[in-house]
Amino acid sequence: MRFKRVFLIVMDSLGVGASEDANQYFNEGVDDTKANTFGHIAESMDLRIPNLEKLGVGNIIPIKGTKSVELSSSYVTKIREKSLGKDTMTGHWEIMGLYVTTPFQTFTDTGFPKELLDELEERTGRKIIGNIAASGTEILKDLGEEHMRTGDLIVYTSADSVLQIAMHEEIIPIEEQYRISAIARDITMRPDWKVGRVITRPFLGTNKDNFKRTSNRKDYALKPSEETTLNFLSDANYDVIALGKINDIFDGYGINKYSKTVSNDDGMKQITEWAKKDFTGLCFLNLVDFDALYGHRRDPHGYGKAIMDMDSQLPELMANLNEDDLLILTADHGNDPTYVGTDHTREFVPMIAYSKSFKSGGSLPILNTFADLGSTISDNFKVKKTEHGDSFLSKLK
C-alpha cells in the first residue's frame, strides 16, 4: 500500500470543456459542444484561485486569470466520461468503476408522463398537482396551501433524474408519506420511467409565507447494479467514509461510515477534520453547492465565488495531510452556468492528484474514463478491481 489514506473530492459539475460526444447531449435543443463550465466562469468574473493555480488547474485548460505553472507535487489532466448520461449518479458510479449504459430518465422539460401519474394516483388514492421542474421552496409557496385543502400530492422534478413528493406532516402522517414514496419508487423502476431517486419532501407551516421543509426527508435511491470499488475496499476492511450526498448516490452500498453536509463549506470542514484522524482507506466527499445552487440556476458569479471559497479552504486540508496521503480533486459532469437551459453539460472533468511524497509533478495524458480513478484507488490498496478503468498509480512519482 503506497498511500494509507486517499481523499477524493468531487467538485460537483465543475467541467473543463465539452467532450468529443457533446453533440449528442442537449440543453433546450442546443447541443453541449460549446460548454465549458470552469472556463466560462473565469471569463465572466475576476476568478482568483491561488491554491488551485499552484496545484495546476491552469495547466489542464486555459482559465482566464489563472497561470499555467511548473508542477512539483501534483499531477493534472482531464478525464472523458464513457457512460451514457451527464448526471450525478452516472458520473459517480463511473468513478467507482460502474458504467451506466442506459441513461437515467429526466423529465425537466416535459414533466412526468400521464400514465405514470395515473398509476401513482390509483395506487395512493390521491390526486397529483404540480408535475413540473421547480425549486422545492418555491413550489411550496405556489401549491402548499392547495395541498393542505385537498390532500393532493405535490409532485415535481428538477434537472436531475429525480421524482420528489412534497407533503405536509399534519395532512399526511410521515409513515404514510414514506409508503406513498415507496410506491412511486416501485413505479419508476421501469426502464422508460427509471429515475435515479425518489425523494419524500415533508414540510410544516400554516400558509405560503411560513412553510418550511423538515428533516424527515427520505431518499429512495437506486443501489448500484454491480459491486464497485467501494465494495471491494469495505470487503477488505478498509474505511470507506462518505461525506455529503455520496452515501445517497451509492445507496450506502460499500460504505461503512458516512455523514451529510449542509454546504460546501461544511463539507470542506468535515474532510479537514477527517484528515486529522487516523484511518486507513478512502474519504470521499461531494461538494454539491456548485451544481445545485449555481450551475442549474445559471449563476456564474455565485459559482465562481463558491470556487474561490473552496480554494481558500484547501491550505488547511493540505496542511493536515501526511506524507503517505493522496488527495484527488475531480468532478462528475459539467453544468455551465453561462449556457442555455438549466441542465448539466457533457464535459471533460479535471483531475488533480497531490501528495507531499511526490518527488515531481506534471501533466498526464487524457484519461479515457472516470473509472481510472477507482482503478487507481483499488491498485493502491491492492483490492479487487472492477472491469473498467486503468490505474495511473505508477505514473505518480
Swiss-Prot record:
InterPro entries: Alkaline_phosphatase_core_sf, DeoB, Metalloenzyme, Phosphopentomutase_DeoB_cap_sf. It is an enzyme of class 5 (isomerase). Keywords: Cytoplasm, Isomerase, Manganese, Metal-binding. CDD domains: PPM. Pfam families: Metalloenzyme. One of its GO terms (molecular function) is manganese ion binding. GO terms for cellular component: cytosol. Its main location: cytoplasm. Mn(2+) 1 binds at residues 12, 332-333. GO terms for biological process: 2-deoxyribose 1-phosphate catabolic process; 5-phosphoribose 1-diphosphate biosynthetic process; metabolic compound salvage; nucleotide metabolic process. This is Phosphopentomutase. The gene is deoB.
